């Protein structure tokens, strides 16, 4: 929690500095102002995480963040860093993961940019659903109001084909009555920190 607070304070300080810079530059179109100006964009991402080592960039292995960062950097011809709303683990899929990046050059045609990006990413089972220009007060992680996680159990003897790698296959019949009773114990404010990997 302290780590998250420090990140947030750092981010808030950055926003303050940007606003100060904005006020120092009386003409936002001047060369001085343009050299400080960064354009921020939010993207919504859908992906199948089966062949990835999760969201976050790692030294070894293919990650969602790493691949998208690399493709955006190539298209814009500048190094960018992608910030995600959350860090999903290995093999986890996403329907609408929010992320943002900053770049020096304004993207003139957003739909063309997404089309070019998806040309490469779709082969990797990643799709950019939407892109939107955002203000500097937006942050994919700290501006997120909610996160929804879905866990799928496929309870039958035969192996799933369509839902392969998209759910937990359990052969033995589950006792839903006991499961519902146990689920009630999870409702409310709880500390599940001991269950972390």
Role assignments for model-derived ranges:
Residues 13-17:
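Intrinsically disordered, glycine-rich low-complexity segments
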Residues 36-197:
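Structured-RNA-binding interfaces characteristic of tRNA pseudouridine synthases
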Residues 5, 9-12, 24, 28, ...:
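Short hydrophobic targeting helices and cationic amphipathic motifs
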């Amino acid at each position: 929690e302290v780590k998250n607070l420090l990140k947030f304070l750092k981010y808030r300080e950055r926003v303050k500095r940007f606003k100060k810079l904005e006020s120092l530059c009386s003409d936002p179109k001047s060369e001085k102002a343009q050299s400080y100006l960064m354009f921020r964009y939010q993207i919504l991402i859908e992906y199948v995480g089966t062949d990835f080592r999760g969201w976050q960039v790692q030294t070894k292995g293919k990650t969602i963040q790493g691949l998208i960062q690399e493709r955006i950097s190539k298209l814009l011809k500048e190094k960018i860093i992608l910030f995600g709303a959350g860090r999903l683990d290995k093999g986890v899929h996403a329907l609408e993961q929010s992320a943002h990046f900053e770049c020096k050059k304004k993207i003139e045609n957003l739909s063309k940019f997404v089309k070019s990006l998806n040309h490469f990413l779709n082969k990797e089972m990643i799709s950019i659903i939407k892109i939107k220009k955002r203000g500097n007060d937006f942050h994919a992680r700290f501006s997120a109001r909610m996160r929804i996680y879905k866990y799928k159990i496929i309870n039958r003897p035969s192996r799933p084909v369509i839902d392969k790698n998209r759910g937990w296959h359990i052969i033995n019949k589950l006792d839903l009555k006991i499961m519902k009773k146990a689920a009630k114990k999870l409702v409310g404010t709880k500390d599940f920190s001991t269950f972390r990997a």
